[in-house]
Amino acid sequence: MSLDSCPDCEMPVAQTLNSGHRPVEVDAPMDSGDLSRRGFMKTATATAAAMSVSAAVPRILSAREEAKPTSENLVKKLYESLSDKQKAEVCFSWDHTDDRGLLRTHVSNNWNITDEKELAIGGSFFTRNQQDMIEALFFGLYNPDWHSKIRKQLQDDAGGYGKSQSIAIFGSPASDKFEFVMTGRHLTIRCDGNSTEHVAFGGPIFYGHAASGFNEPASHEGNVYWHQALKANGLYKMLDGKQQQKALIEKAPHEAAAGFREKGIEIPGLPILELSADQKSHAQEVLQALIEPYRTSDQDEVKKCLAANGGLDQCRLAFYKSGDLGDDGVWDNWRLEGPTFVWHFRGNPHVHVWVNVADNASVPLNARG
């Protein structure tokens, strides 16, 4: 992909597939209204993250479930509340496939897993109570300290929460094998209760932000994720000349190429193993900055997958000369990669981040960008 183009404006063919999927007009103006129920969210999402439930939301959680009000429990309550007609539109078998492959595993930078207009989470397809549950379980997947930042990203990129996001549920939440997926522009996130084997986050995820328009300035002012790149660039500045030479690569790979490499194929970049103690400490800070937006259980799952494959020491850090906005030597495009860990950060023309973390390199990637 050239730097003159972006997957946001060259939409995947999958946007126009069967099942009523419609193409997204990325740059079309959107209504700036906010559909979220902030009063409800102050209780439901905060308590979900804190593992305790306020009496303000009894209509969502039964007394028996109050001891464990996770996003997973909310998926189950949502599923139980859906009518047969609703289930026919947003619920699928575990192994459902279409032109996008195994649908529950698909990831892209700008897509909708179900029709974003007819089945939008903020539209008339869902009842008010169902909308509240979806909002609570969605924000329950994030660190509470990040809720306002996630709202800002959704406002900047999609006109706000509930405007053009869609969901799907795979399998049966009544069993131990299910997955909830929410999608939209710069959004793919999952909730699976660790029922998807070998992977963190329930599978590959995507996040991004175009804070000040499609083409951001080199400063990326207002971008809620740019601090991650600054943290990584801080490590680059700590490297000596030889280390920088290993870390800096001329051209970035295609951003969606986030699959795991075959055994024996060397990962480009500077091995974390070769860093000094203070540099390794900073590398851990980079990792923490990457996983910080998410709930504790998902952060722990990432660390567990890393540990199963030698930890951060087995990863490599690469920065790319191509796409350096402002030619300022602050590398907009970079990647942290290990045998079963890919975190690809593309900052030009705005932020796209592809995440693929597992404990087993045999897990295939189903990405399109």
Could you describe each region identified by the protein language model?
Residues 17, 44-48, 106:
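N-terminal compositionally biased, intrinsically disordered segments and leader/signal-like regions
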Residues 64-84, 88-369:
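A cross-kingdom marker for long, charged
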Residues 6, 11, 22, 28, ...:
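Intrinsic-disorder/low-complexity coil detector
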Residues 24-28, 39-61:
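N-terminal export signals
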